[in-house]
Amino acid sequence: MKYNKKFMLEAIRVANENIQNQGGPFGAVIVKDGEIIAASGNSVTTDNDPTAHAEVNTIRKACKKLGTFNLEGCEIYSSCEPCPMCLSAIYWAHIDKLYYATTKDDAASIGFDDSFIYHELTLQPHQRRVHAEQHDRDIALEPFNIWRDKTDKTEY
């Protein structure tokens, strides 16, 4: 896998087009074996879905198209450095390589500042802005134990 400018230009084209369709200024494409498998822009406001970032939307499309949740062998080209949520999704999807154009600082300069999330992740759950409390661990371990012992599970 080697960087190919034509795929980045497509991600940027999707970002530009997305702005015209009431979306945010972000686009992404997923490539496998030199072919675009999926492309999408950010649709947070049009879908009323705060998780509908370009990378997540593109991962969802690629998984549906390929019929798998595992995107090993794929690359993702993003018009911007992914936010923490999208970066996590890239890892969970097992994408092999990430290429991005603009940086998280570039995004922050136009109002998309994720630095507070990076900071929040360094804090203990009870110190975060969204205060978290743990309850009923003993009861909630039951499904974990069932999963651990399940012999016909599909691991991911």
Question: What kind of region is each of these model predictions?
Answer:
Residues 1-19, 82, 89-156:
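Zinc-dependent deaminase
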Residues 2, 24-25, 45-53, 81, ...:
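Residues at secondary-structure transition points
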Residues 11, 15-18, 28, 38, ...:
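Small-residue (primarily alanine) positions within well-ordered alpha-helices
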Residues 22-26, 72:
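Short, basic and Ser/Thr-rich N-terminal targeting/leader segments
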Residues 26-34:
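Short beta-strand scaffold segments in enzyme catalytic cores
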Residues 28, 67-68, 122-124:
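Short secondary-structure boundary/capping segments
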Residues 37-44:
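Short beta->alpha transition motifs characteristic of CBS
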Residues 52, 56-93:
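Helix-adjacent hinge/juxtasegments
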